[in-house]
């Protein structure tokens, strides 16, 4: 009975059919690259309910795509923690690949 309001920063589609939902996060997890490792980012994702946000964004993206083309096997959600991005490592990049089959009940 309510409404949600939000914005997906970027949806990227590759030639191979891969679809990525990209959201930029400005959370301050520390002042060192090491502070933006997988454990710290996962803690922030949990603490700020970003798992729920990822699911909502994945459902919204799948609904949009379903009207326009074949659905991919997965929606690849990427949170870019911009304060900790490292072009030479995985710091600052949080990933969750959500199978579209897990979203089916919300796509009907």
Question: Where is each model-derived feature located?
Answer:
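Structural signature of nuclease core domains in nucleic-acid processing machines
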Residues: 1-108
